[in-house]
From Swiss-Prot:
Statement: the UniProt record of this protein carries the keyword RNA-binding: yes
Entries under CDD domains matching the protein: Csm2_III-A (cd09647)
Keywords noted in UniProt: Antiviral defense, RNA-binding
Taxonomic source organism: Streptococcus thermophilus
One Gene Ontology biological process: defense response to virus
Organismal lineage: Bacteria, Bacillati, Bacillota, Bacilli, Lactobacillales
Self-association state and partner proteins as the record states: Part of the Csm effector complex that includes at least Cas10(1), Csm2(3), Csm3(5), Csm4(1), Csm5(1) and mature crRNA. The Csm complex is elongated and slightly twisted with a maximal length of 215 Angstroms and a diameter of 75-80 Angstroms. It has been modeled to have a central protein filamant of Csm3 subunits along which the dsRNA helix of paired crRNA and target RNA binds. The filament is capped at one end by Cas10 and Csm4 and at the other end by Csm5; ssDNA is thought to bind to the N-terminal HD domain of Cas10.
GO molecular function, one term: RNA binding
UniProt xrefs under InterPro entries: CRISPR-assoc_prot_Csm2_III-A (IPR010149)
Entry protein name: CRISPR system Cms protein Csm2
Amino acid sequence: MAILTDENYVDKAERAISLLEKDNKGNYLLTTSQIRKLLSLCSSLYDRSKERKFDELINDVSYLRVQFVYQAGREIAVKDLIEKAQILEALKEIKDRETLQRFCRYMEALVAYFKFYGGKD
């Protein structure tokens, strides 16, 4: 079964954000800048997916996974998000334009719930 579906990706985003690590004051360890950086990596790919065939984007999807791994290696809070949101697993499931665009919407939902639940810089 797919990690992300049209029916579940919003709920999965909310759940992932609710599980993120917080400091002793109840603030997220992840910052808005960190999560928005991940979203920006997806946004340009989403835009290109509207204009190009999926076959032309396969390398970009693979590189996106590399970028997420790199960011996770740099920041423990980003790694926490990537693990709890199952981002790497979801990236591996991208097989066509539809699953790519769903993943990008999932990233938007993660940012939205992060801000909704009080994420700050």
